[in-house]
Structures are given as structure tokens and as C-alpha cells.
Amino acid sequence: MNRESVLTIVEASLSRPTGTPNTSDLPRDKFIEQEKAKLRASLIEPIQVQAYPSEWATEQCGLADKTYDFVAVASEGDSGTYWLLLDPATNDFYKAWRGVDAGEKMYLLGYHSDDALTEWRG
């Protein structure tokens, strides 16, 4: 996937209502716009990645214990600790994490949906 197609999918998601809870003292609308801006600022050049479900994700979220192929669309944290992944087959977003060493495996939180902001905020 190229950057333009990823941006189209992300922006379509951000244009829909979100299930993201307001965890601030701000009015909900302002909080959501602030969080959308943070996500947009964290977008990266799309890259193909592989991720693995954590034990919790297989037991509680029904993910199969296998390697999954995704497109990484956003990253934050030290050396890309937290990631927003996109499944191009379904346009669902997943949150993932990995250690600070680039060679470490990427693990899926487990939840996924077409709500980019909700998944990004984990």
C-alpha cells in the first residue's frame, strides 16, 4: 500500500464517529480533535510488517496463534515502541507493541476495528 491509499483509509476512519473515551477535562469534541491531531502527527511512511498475537490476544480476542501480515501506518514511543497496524484485506486497525530493539517481535494487543483512533489509543 502506498501513503496515499493509507491516508485515504485513515481519514475515512477519522471522519466517522469514534468509540474513543474522553479521558481528559476537555469537552469531548475538543479532546477527540486533539487526539486525531496526535494520530495524524504519528503517521509514518507505510511499511510491511509481521506481528504475532500475545497469549492474551489468542485467549481473549480469538486471534489464531500465527504470524499476521500488516501495514504499519503510525508509530510512537522510543524507537517505535507502539504501532498502529492496518490489515489491508479488511481495513481494520490493530494496536501493537515491541521492545526498543528493532529486531524484537511485534505483538498485537488483540482488539481490532475500523476505528483508527480507538485502536491507536489502545
Feature roles, as predicted:
Residues 1-61:
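N-terminal domain-onset segments
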Residues 17, 60, 75-78, 97, ...:
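Intrinsically disordered, low-complexity segments enriched in small/polar residues
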Residues 40-91:
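Amphipathic, interaction-prone secondary-structure segments
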Residues 62, 85-122:
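Acidic, proline/glycine-rich low-complexity IDRs
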